[in-house]
């Protein structure tokens, strides 16, 4: 009889502990669903999504070619002040315009680093999720992003493109390296220099990866007309669930569509 009571007591305690853990997890998840998040651009919004945020709003319209140049308005400042969290990178013109005023809002500020490498995506998503208490949602989203890049890497290797020499825009080098491409040199984001043009003129570069937000690779084609050019983007054209992985998939698709013959081509995602 005594043994039965002990077993019964242990079962009751186990059930109570399980219920407590479930309630805590549900409470944490629920808390992350009720916060309002606003981001500076579609790129920082995409990181917010990977961090587990939903219904993220943006200040700079996603349709802009170079969103960081967006000039903030009084209405935008009011939107930021009403949000629980504002996610930004720091290089945006709006941050310079607001100056010290941004620190005087009622909004919690989260500054992140924007590059699309797997390592950075994991780090920034974890930073955001920690603040929003949205780790439960972030984990699967980051996993899906990594799968897109890893699958792209396999496709690049299958086509033999990992053996080709690449001259890459500095703002796109992170994804290029994660895809297993051989980056032999970089250019940008400033104007091309004489030495960079001379480097490509020597020959040996099979692919040039340019950046749609400030494309500057055209002069390189004049000195290396048989080199293939693909133009990638960093700022998603939409603000939605999975926007970064969808954009990266388009970048990968554009790369894989490059003709492998001698005809030059310029492909945009």
PLM segments and residue spans:
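Extracytoplasmic ligand-binding site segments that recognize negatively charged/polar headgroups
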Residues: 95, 99, 107-135, 161-178, ...
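Structured C-terminal subdomain patch of bacterial secreted/periplasmic proteins
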Residues: 35-36, 119-122, 126, 130, ...
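N-terminal glycine-rich anion-binding loop in soluble enzyme alpha/beta folds
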Residues: 28, 34-67
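Alpha-helical, coiled-coil/dimerization segments enriched in small aliphatic residues
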Residues: 51-76, 172-199, 233-241
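Basic- and aromatic-lined ligand-binding clefts that recognize polyanionic substrates
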Residues: 33-40, 44-48, 137-188, 192-200
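Periplasmic-binding protein-like
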Residues: 85-90, 139, 206-212
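Short, low-complexity disordered leader/linker segments with a strong preference
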Residues: 1-34, 267-269
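Acidic/His-rich segments in extracytoplasmic proteins that coordinate ligands and/or metal ions
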Residues: 23, 55-134, 217-228
